[in-house]
Amino acid sequence: MMTLRHLPFILLLILSGELYAEEKQCDFPTVENGRIAQYYYTFKSFYFPMSVDKKLSFFCLAGYATESGKQEEQIRCTAEGWSPNPRCYKKCLKPDLRNGYVSNDKVLYKLQERMSYGCSSGYKTTGGKDEEVVHCLSAGWSSQPSCRKEQETCLAPELEHGNYSTTQRTFKVKDIVAYTCTAGYYTTTGKQTGEAECQANGWSLTPQCNKLMCSSLRLIENGYFHPVKQTYEEGDVVQFFCHENYYLSGSDLIQCYNFGWYPESPICEGRRNRCPPPPVPLNSKIQPHSTTYRHGERVHIECELNFVIQGSEELLCENGKWTEPPKCIEEKEKVACEQPPSVENGVAHPHSEIYYSGDKVTYRCGGGYSLRGSSTITCNRGRWTLPPECVENIENCKPPPDIANGVVVDGLLASYTTGSSVEYRCNEYYLLKGSETSRCEQGAWSSPPVCLEPCTIDVDHMNRNNIQLKWKYEGKILHGDLIDFVCKQGYNLSPSIPLSEISAQCNRGDVRYPMCIRKESKGMCASPPVIRNGDIVSSAARTYENGSSVEYRCFDNHFLQGSQNVYCVDGVWTTPPSCLEPCTLSFVEMDKNYLQLKWNFDNRPLILHGEYIEFMCKRDAYISETSIAGSVLRVQCDRGRLKYPKCTPRDRRLSFQEALRTRRQMEKR
């Protein structure tokens, strides 16, 4: 029975628990341009959050130092977080200054420190002065100190593939010279023209004209291209080909322009992604016409005059086959049309009291007007086809229409007359549909193209549908591209169709993800395999259903190699992981090899498999290997074994006392 005398002890426990909880203030620190000891990363959940007043060391990467200029420094956990903020800055070293001098003898400069330097007679600083002050910033010196020969004049360099605006070749300081590159060549900023200023230390930039290059092309799946180069010059054309049983989707020819490759590289699709020409019923026509038809595309069937459709007006391309086509059956009775529609500023010929299917009329416009559309319309089963318009003759068009996710790349003018045209290009990853060119005709532009949106993979949607990617996709997926999935282990497309590979098509930014369901049980598994230095997280059962899994864990300080989960597949377990032993630091081996630890934080009883530890030779010893000393003294733990490097003691002369001691020993003998 609890009494009042137990109350202080209980309160103490509660308060100390609250205080302990409040002390855990500091999360895992991120060290810019540096790191902390490896075991903190490995046992992150054990050490963090860290209690107030706890300390740890961090060290900087090569070429960086702490704010105080040290290679290693300690930080302390406070109620406000880590103090000081762990950060490493790029070291600012005293420059090796030719034809100049530095105002002090310091070798290393801390952050925000200033350094003053000057140049010898006849030389100027990078800013064109006799003396200059630079600051040590986090990325190095504010400007790299150097001394350049002072010049009263500048000589224009030889300009290949370009011309200067003047025949003059010698220029005074502050003179500016303009130059133009020949066709196909550009300045360093990618322009056709450029300027350079003559300064006391030479030209502000060296005039030059270079040929623009396009990047190398990535290989296409199930295809190849020719020619293959590391870089391509402007104007180069590359042709693409597909392997047997695959077809090109896109242009087979692409060209290197000053803005890059255009059009985009095609892809090679398999037979199942394409359909043959659609079956056209007798007495009909199809829209739209195309040279290729891809999975998911549709065509419209329209019967000829005096024929009616029986069945669906649309055909769908599905996995290389067309849906069932309709039939066009002849009408038994003629159907009359009303009088042709009237067109403003136009007349129709010939005139009749009654019109039947198949009858045609033609429109003509009055003076000062032109036809827009087909001049002839037809009576078709009681309805007239679309009549034309008579529009006023206007030569100029407004600026070309903008398109979503695309731009005009060629043909921009101050004004546009009939016959003018512009060329469109879609943004990266967007697929151009329609004609890339739009023309000005009688004051109106022909229809511009449409840029079809790409798709991005939705991982959450995939997880809900029990699927994963078959291949790794980089960046976006173009409209029309197929994405290959596989069912996750233990799942199938459906019980009746045991397919493991499934595909979906990108359609204007949308992907219809397939769904997999759990497989039917085909076999039970016995207890999961036993592993050395580890066990399973949950208690083992005698039997497991097909598709079930168990999770392994390693004993403390052991490194898990492989998948921590194994699965029961048709009565057999997948391969279990291995638990790799840690290494134990031996000070006996260190003394034998004249070694000591380079870093204090490496003084720990265990080093995990894969972790590195750095040694250094003791005083009056040197590394005996012929390799680079730094790499030899950095050792990795490999399955419980450390290969200690060997340092050799230096030869040294005997001291007076040692010589006297040696002499006495010799005399005793």
UniProtKB/Swiss-Prot annotation:
Disulfide bonds: 26-77, 60-88, 92-136, 119-147, 154-198, 181-209, 214-256, 242-268, 275-317, 303-328, 337-379, 365-390, 397-440, 426-451, 455-506, 487-516, 525-568, 554-579, 583-637, 617-647
Complex and partners: Tetramer of two A chains (F13A1) and two B (F13B) chains.
Position of the signal peptide: 1-21
GO BP field: blood coagulation; blood coagulation, fibrin clot formation
Tissue: Predominantly expressed in liver and kidney.
Pfam family, one: Sushi
Database matches in Gene3D superfamilies: Complement Module, domain 1 (2.10.70.10)
UniProt xrefs under SUPFAM superfamilies: Complement control module/SCR domain (SSF57535)
Main location: secreted
InterPro entries: ComplSys_Reg/VirEntry_Med, Sushi/SCR/CCP_sf, Sushi_SCR_CCP_dom
Keywords of this entry: Blood coagulation, Disulfide bond, Glycoprotein, Hemostasis, Repeat, Secreted, Signal, Sushi
Source domain of life: Eukaryota
Record domain Sushi: where: 25-89, 90-149, 152-211, 212-270, 273-330, 335-392, 395-453, 454-517, 523-581, 582-648
Protein task: The B chain of factor XIII is not catalytically active, but is thought to stabilize the A subunits and regulate the rate of transglutaminase formation by thrombin.
Residues listed as glycosylation sites in the UniProt record: 163, 546
PANTHER family: COAGULATION FACTOR XIII B CHAIN (PTHR45785:SF3), COMPLEMENT FACTOR H-RELATED (PTHR45785)
Gene Ontology CC: one annotated term: extracellular region
Protein name in UniProt: Coagulation factor XIII B chain
Compartmental location: Secreted
